[in-house]
UniProtKB/Swiss-Prot annotation:
Belongs to the IRC6 family. The gene is IRC6. Residues 1-21 are annotated as: Disordered. Involved in gross chromosomal rearrangements (GCRs) and telomere healing. This is Increased recombination centers protein 6. It comes from Candida glabrata (strain ATCC 2001 / BCRC 20586 / JCM 3761 / NBRC 0622 / NRRL Y-65 / CBS 138). The keyword Calcium does not apply. InterPro entries: Irc6. GO terms for molecular function: protein-macromolecule adaptor activity. Keywords: Chromosomal rearrangement.
Length: 265
């Protein structure tokens, strides 16, 4: 847990600093605040904590709260705060964060990354149920990283994706392959790719391909636009509700992407 002197119930998330009264009082305009990314490690998955935080976020032994980080890609940069937590039982942790006491925290979060080692033969149904309850009422993106074997990951992830592919992504920590047919990365490379294409909201995103000079007319970056359209199509399909219509979240995402692309033409 973030606070070693906290309650003996280690599955609780009540000591998360982002929910403190002092910080909540500072929130005057959420639209100018950095998005908050929360990474939680369950049980033995804490063994991968240092490596994951360094590989994905470039954070090395900087405690449980790292503010004013910048996620930089070739085309944009966005400021965010990183929060790190540990728990013994992710089911209790998710239920706690999904309670009314944590409504303000959930409103500030843009992404939760759950890192855990789980066995599909033991706790799939319970984990499914807790995740389903959590994602139904929240707009935060959830990424589940399994540090268990690749075989168990495959079996479990297929079942999860049928549950709700629109709101959660699943990654095998140990998988470093690249799919030949789709050229899609796996493992930590996939995690970074998901963050690259994450629809950041309520924060300042600085586009990098908007520079112009007085003697040269700005031309659209076709490679960027094509790549963006491909990723947007995949994300939009995941946001569909599986019927003839599409979810409100999918429609909002489509509108946002159309605006972003138009601004780069």
């Amino acid at each position: 847990m973030l606070d070693e002197s906290s309650s003996s119930d280690e599955s609780r998330a009540t000591e998360l600093p982002v929910s403190s009264e002092d910080e909540c009082e500072e929130v005057t305009d959420a639209k100018v605040l950095p998005n908050k990314v929360l990474v939680v490690f369950e049980g033995e998955s804490t063994l991968f904590r240092d490596q994951l935080l360094d590989t994905v976020f470039g954070v090395q032994d900087q405690g449980n709260i790292v503010k004013q980080l910048s996620w930089d890609t070739k085309y944009y940069a966005v400021e965010y705060d990183l929060y790190v937590d540990e728990c013994v039982d992710i089911h209790g942790w998710l239920n706690e964060v999904n309670s009314d006491d944590y409504e303000e925290l959930r409103d500030l979060l843009t992404m939760i990354i759950i890192v855990r080692s789980f066995d599909s033969t033991q706790d799939t149904k319970e984990y499914n149920s807790v995740l389903y309850d959590f994602i139904q009422g929240n707009s935060v993106s959830v990424i589940s990283v399994n540090t268990n074997s690749a075989r168990q990951v495959k079996d479990t992830y297929d079942e999860f994706l049928e549950l709700d592919a629109s709101s959660i992504e699943f990654i095998n920590y140990h998988d470093d392959r690249v799919e030949k047919e789709t050229n899609e990365c796996k493992g930590m490379a996939r995690l970074k790719e998901i963050i690259d294409t994450h629809p950041w909201t309520d924060c300042k995103v600085v586009l990098k391909n908007k520079e112009s000079t007085s003697d040269k007319v700005n031309k659209p970056d076709l490679e960027y636009l094509i790549d963006t359209l491909k990723k947007a199509k995949i994300h939009y399909q995941k946001l569909s509700n599986g019927s003839d219509g599409f979810s409100e979240e999918a429609e909002q995402f489509a509108l946002q992407m159309a605006t972003d692309i138009a601004n780069n033409l």
